[in-house]
């Protein structure tokens, strides 16, 4: 069964296949089911980009979308996530997309359910589809991963985006650096090396900024926000020192004038809205992989 839970479960070949399908969709290829197929979106945390991106992807593929509301469901009566998924499975749903506040919520589910789980983000743990759309954006820009230098900057400790990207990009041959306030370093993430931001600015090919996750911080940590942009954000002055041909990325939502100067969000280097566009194509590819009997499947040569 083609769950998509973490980037660690995907080989280089599987990543390449997903990216190739996503590129095909980006180039106008159509793939649409002619049989009624239900997919459920279960979002237990707030989301704009991921939720709507999945829904657009599902509808482009001709899938019938069930949007689950935890507040209006039997979760409020104590129903477990397992029972919710089994209920959806029993009434004919063929796959579930889940975002949940619990790290690795899927560990207790993946071997017990009979339909694919597509992880749309688990707590501070993993965000595989965000990683895949980031990979697609980088590949479109540079045509490769091998030898690229990539800085992941900001709230590394709380970021599922940092974990997924650092692991996958290292696997694909890129060199990863982190820049972060001391309070937000993640010493358990061994896929990169910490360096001062101002050393990285003129060196890296990709400046990947992370959202400051106010909802996961205590009061003490929130106090440093006043100085964050000056010390740890991408200011206009820092952008001017970036190397020629380098790009700016951010998973969004963006805290303007915190992680990045507002005037840089749509500057020439920025690929922030391109990432959002690519999210639809990647999620179409991931759904195709999860539902091969409905949407078909194809194999591609390794192109990383």
Curated annotation (Swiss-Prot):
The keyword Transferase applies. Catalyzes the condensation of carbamoyl phosphate and aspartate to form carbamoyl aspartate and inorganic phosphate, the committed step in the de novo pyrimidine nucleotide biosynthesis pathway. Pathway: Pyrimidine metabolism; UMP biosynthesis via de novo pathway; (S)-dihydroorotate from bicarbonate: step 2/3. It catalyses: carbamoyl phosphate + L-aspartate = N-carbamoyl-L-aspartate + phosphate + H(+). Heterododecamer (2C3:3R2) of six catalytic PyrB chains organized as two trimers (C3), and six regulatory PyrI chains organized as three dimers (R2). Belongs to the aspartate/ornithine carbamoyltransferase superfamily. ATCase family. GO terms for molecular function: amino acid binding; aspartate carbamoyltransferase activity. L-aspartate binds at residues 77, 160, 211. GO terms for cellular component: cytosol. The keyword Transferase applies. It is an enzyme of class 2 (transferase). GO terms for biological process: 'de novo' pyrimidine nucleobase biosynthetic process; 'de novo' UMP biosynthetic process; amino acid metabolic process. Its EC number is 2.1.3.2. It holds the Pfam family OTCace_N. Carbamoyl phosphate binds at residues 49-50, 99, 127, 130, 252-253. Disulfide bonds: none annotated. This is Aspartate carbamoyltransferase catalytic subunit.
């Amino acid at each position: 069964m083609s769950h998509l839970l973490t980037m660690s479960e995907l080989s280089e070949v599987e990543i390449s296949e997903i990216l190739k399908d996503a590129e095909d969709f980006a180039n106008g290829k159509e793939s649409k089911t002619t049989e009624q197929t239900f997919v459920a979106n279960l979002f237990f945390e707030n989301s704009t980009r991921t939720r709507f991106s999945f829904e657009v992807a599902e509808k482009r593929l001709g899938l019938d979308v069930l949007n689950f509301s935890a507040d209006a469901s039997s979760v409020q009566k104590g129903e477990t996530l397992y029972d919710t998924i089994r209920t959806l499975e029993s009434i004919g749903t063929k796959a579930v997309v889940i975002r949940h506040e619990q790290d690795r919520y899927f560990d207790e589910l993946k071997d017990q359910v009979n339909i694919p789980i597509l992880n749309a983000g688990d707590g501070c743990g993993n965000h595989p589809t965000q990683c895949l759309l980031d990979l697609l954006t980088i590949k479109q820009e540079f045509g490769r991963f091998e030898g690229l230098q990539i800085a992941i900057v900001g709230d590394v400790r709380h970021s599922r985006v940092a974990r997924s990207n650092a692991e996958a990009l290292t696997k694909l041959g890129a060199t990863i650096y982190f820049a972060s306030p001391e309070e937000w370093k993640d010493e358990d993430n061994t896929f990169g090396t910490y360096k001062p931001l101002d050393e990285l600015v003129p060196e890296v090919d990709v400046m990947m900024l992370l959202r400051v996750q106010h909802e996961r911080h205590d009061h003490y940590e929130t106090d440093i926000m006043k100085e964050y942009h000056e010390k740890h954000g991408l200011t206009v002055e820092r952008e001017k020192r970036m190397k020629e041909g380098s790009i700016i990325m951010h998973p969004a939502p963006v805290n303007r004038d915190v992680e990045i100067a507002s005037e840089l969000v749509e500057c020439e280097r920025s690929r922030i809205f391109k990432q959002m566009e690519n999210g639809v194509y990647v999620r179409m590819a991931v759904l195709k992989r999860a539902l091969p009997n409905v949407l078909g499947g194809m194999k591609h040569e390794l192109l990383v």
